[in-house]
């Protein structure tokens, strides 16, 4: 059996090869002149200056010397009857001899019958041929696609402005032989096999067909085991069903293998080519090809008994068919090299035919096309004053709206209108009195298919029939008296008519009509064309020029295509792409770019190839670290145990990352580093066989290859990383990282040694993690105008998008250029403020200009995005408005570039670009500029100076640091951290929390601070002081910040009893300055920002949005800072009563973004406590002040006191979020401390009162104290008395 299959496949291959050779031979040297020997009667035209068509052969000089119409206007044509169907490969034209008459451009049309013409198209557009520039020269055109027809028409489009239309023509080609079969819709051909079953590994089926209807079976075959192959027309499209040895199913329930073509019921020839090799199938209709893999269990197609063509007959029931039969003609039908129609014509025994004839009978149907939605119409006369009315026709269109018919009825009956509205037919009869009646029927009638419409009015009964579905008007029409009028306007109304003669409440119809009957009489539309019947405007007669603009579908990435008569539109919803053709991704290409655009950490979609074919993939971007990690999670994240596996029954688990391998590979290739953590734990289930070193366990990587090495070790070595480093803590456990990008990601793990007694294994594969974008900072520098980089030609064709960054100081320069045989593409900076995108697809160049209001040669990075698709061309610079231009419908949109792509210059080495270009993308493809620059003179890899453009991204005092592949933000001198110094450093303080920063030589983290910041380390007092902080609290009084100058002098920022902000400057034992800033209670559970700036004797204080200013007197002298304290001051110092009271309770709340000049003490305590001169006492918890605001917002607002700083009066309702447990503890501590404090204060008050009384009764020259009074308490008393006597208080 195998030998028979092999022999059958060889014969099929040979026969199909011979068939292709035969076709090639037919086209070989097919360039004979076909018009030279035609008789004059073979020429016809729309009109002629002599009254009868003159001979118009090439080089003809007799008579009028060629053809000229009686009137040089649109819709003139010259027609040739070539006698039989021939193959036309070229044409040539001249002007009329001895005259100023010639045609400068023209269209070609062809037909088999002299009716139902077809326009010559190239690249899916009506092709315009360039004509002559004088009367004598010959212009020759080789057709890109040969044409098979009997009749050919030359349709002048433009001609000599100083003359008229004049043509002499020649047609080149050769004879065309074919075998044709005509199917009447009730017959079929059967090809019986010599054996019961035909088994094939390869099939080749080819044919051409011309259909009279939109549905019908072209061929069908099936086998008893479920194999089947069926090709049929459905709604004007070809549907292929193909299945190999699968379970048998009814055809109605089978999903089509492929659907191709559209509008295939246009009565024109269409070619089909189907090739199958095993499960791989190539399916071509006309010039559209679809490649796919068929379903089934084998690669052999088994067909039993026969193949049927034209229908599917029911066995044992002659004349009965399963589905609708094909009605039309089939030509040159080949099945695996066998000419089926030739066998039928010769009545070979393999062929059984029904009522099939072998010539193509075609009805003489004349279609018309309404071209213009404003001015197209057709006027046809009718027979007036008939009691009743009858009109019928067929139409097809893509437009939802349009006027189909308008006629003024006789005897004052009113006006009858038939309108297409939102794809539904609306019949409206308007009476002269204003009353009327209407009916709606049909839906989606703008689907491009032919639809039949009939209006019949008889004996006051109005019936509207659409596609055999009849509907009658409402009962009130029984009183209507309707009499036919004498004029019928189809499609629209002329401008010169009165309203009553033709009504058009909607735009004119754009589409095709045919088979028009009025009063049951067919209308001769050729007579309309010749001017002997009716009238028309903007019509194509004897031609239906409908075009399916959604085939092929130019909406990319799964966009849904919809269309009108003149254009198509792409619905990009839920695709992840945008633009006129869904070409541009709405997602960024890496986490690096998301970070660069200011996004925070979270889940994002990353589209690694931008506008390329790969879709977006969801990842997690951790943008809070210096290295931006991109994480792709898979479906199995937990430690998984395995038991009972062996070499015969291995354990295998596949990991699903939620995307294709191509998406993952693109993500990995575009990253600088990738890794996956792997963990393997085992008991009596080894990784490797110690005898022959064969692996017991391995994993599968990206290339579907086995890898026996494990975490931390180099690829190709069967060992674990901890074994290499001799750092294994457990013999039965290994954890490490896989970091070979060529092998990642891990797609499968195999374990074969966990079936021994008491043996088990456990594994865990971590997510795929990558950092770095290899292309975002990929840059080159061009140093001379003659330097450039060159790459292979830019393959664009239908869509082209270009994007890159540039910076320069030059006045002009070309960014890139690519030339073709006819067209080109160029992007350049034409002046310091102008960028031009020029493109030519072969007809005429288009230039888009963007003018910038600012100079582009400022040595800053600027972004350019240019795009050209079949709908529009656009250019954008930075965030300036886009310059966009729609592409003309008739234009040639296929851009073919043949030369090399030049970056930074041109092949002429002139007008080159001086500066830097980076992150160049062409149609989503990332161009590695740096690698090419390494071997190119005059071009250097990399480009310094990123901080000049992106330094503004370093916030809150962060310093921009240059890197080869970008920049980073140094947050050393900032109270913030993170990639852009935007993450606030904040912490929760409790009543006993104290953070002390000692000023001395800078700690190692701050070694690179500027010279201006070094003043705070000297013994001299700083001339400037800047203090910034944010806080949230519900406690008052509260000490926020304390700066110690000496034991007796300090600066304190606190909240007073009423919650207002106070600044205390204690500059000596006797000199104090107190500033009360506003009266607002800031202990209100909200975040407040304080910014204090002292410059010399000037002091400014900003609280939130309010700014206050003050000037110190000139004699005030400031001192050197020794330490800075946040929270409670724990050491024994001389404090005034307000500071003492605020310090007694400490600070309970959240402090963030604390900075004194260039020192960030809170950040030092949280991040560098081991190396910075900072000491932390009590509990300091890193937190977020923002989360506390949310906690407060979710809680109950109550009145609070100093004993309850967070304001919880309801002891049964804890604080929400992260501070619930902490707040309970804090509240208890505060209550105890407050009780003790008030007790101490009470005792002190009592003692001082007694002491004061004795002091007044016994005056002393010097202060005297009891001998048993503690010395520290004496200092407190001194401080209080001094402050009471010398304090200066300011209210601002």
UniProtKB/Swiss-Prot annotation:
UniProt GO molecular function: calcium ion binding
GO BP, sorted A to Z: cell adhesion
Residues bearing glycans: 282, 496, 571, 622
Domain F5/8 type C: residue ranges: 25-174
Extracellular topological domain: 25-1223
Residue ranges of domain Fibrinogen C-terminal in the record: 584-777
CDD domains per UniProt: EGF_CA (cd00054), FA58C (cd00057), LamG (cd00110)
Protein name in the entry: Contactin-associated protein like 5-2
Lineage: Eukaryota, Metazoa, Chordata, Craniata, Vertebrata
